[in-house]
Amino acid sequence: MKTAFTLIELIFAIVIMGILAVVAIPRLNATRDDAQASTAAANVSVAVMDITSYYTAKGFFTDVKSMSNIVIDDNGNMKVKNTDCFRITVSNATSSEVDPTKGISVGSPILKVVAISSSDNACLSAQRLTRSILDSSPINIGQGNVKFN
């Protein structure tokens, strides 16, 4: 009766573990990308709410970075996995941005969320998850005349 593993049995065990690793590692990476995409999509929604609330409370714009607690760089870009994925800007509407169906006239305060071209899978997934926000941009954020001092 033998009490130890043979070399063949050890080699088979190592081969099986290698096959499992080849299958499992890409799945783990995909799961991580999905989590980052979900987080980014939630952050875009929160940034839109933060900026809208800021404008409602103050009645004016500052830079986008200071109007939200979401991490946005000085250019208004949000990153997913260190890749610029979204650009958020605020401005007053120009004649080319007038949209009566959204209540946007010349000079209306608007918020724009634009997808930045990327090949990163997490970024592309985040852009798909935020499609409704991207499609509704520009967003009129000054429809009311209420100001809080």
List where the protein language model places each region:
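N-terminal single-pass transmembrane signal-anchor helix
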Residues: 1-28
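Generic structural signal for short, solvent-exposed loop/turn connectors between secondary structure elements
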Residues: 1-3, 34, 65, 141
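Generic intrinsically disordered, low-complexity segments enriched for polar/acidic and small residues
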Residues: 2, 9, 51-52, 83, ...
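Alpha-helical protein-protein interaction elements
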Residues: 20, 46-47, 140
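Membrane-proximal N-terminal amphipathic helix
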Residues: 35-63
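Periplasmic/extracellular, small/polar-rich flexible segments of pilin-like filament-forming proteins
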Residues: 56-149
